[in-house]
Amino acid sequence: CIMERENNPKMIGSYVNLKTRMSAGDAHYAGELVEGAHIVTAWGDVGTELAIRLFGDESLFVGYSEVRYTAPVFAGDWMEYGGYIEKVGNTSFTCKFFAYKWMKDSKDENGNVINGSGAEMINPPELCAYGTGTLMVAKNLQRPEFGDPKFAADAKAAGAKAFA
């Protein structure tokens, strides 16, 4: 999936991401497990950035057609939430989303963090979730001239109705 986000000919604009560390307050279940809804919430912020870059508006999230969890996320994990636009219509656009674990706490055999602050890189990053979602911006709210010119140019080249 890392290659998909970097070298995908279907990508409109560019891949955007945000990184954050999961805190003890993010843990919801036993063993400091973070609930999957936390990933979906972060994808909402990724989708908002994509919408601003495309249409100059924050958008409304219509829904997800797919969400798959592939690995657990725990307090202490450093996560990257990212995505890209795959298809643009007249008012809606479809995005691919990803959640990767980049770093985690280093724990001993008893589950305690080594030295109280030990951490380690994960190379390659671990895919924890992926999904597909649709967002929309009403025609009267679209202001692509305030967005990222690369997004508008790619959407137009892909034949997007909004940029015809």
Regions found by a protein language model. Name each.
Residues 7-10, 14, 74-75, 86-164:
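HotDog/MaoC-like acyl-thioester-processing domains
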Residues 47-94, 107-112:
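Hydrophobic beta-strand-centered segment that forms part of the acyl-chain substrate-binding groove
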Residues 1, 48, 138:
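Residue-level marker of positions within ordered structural domains that often coincide
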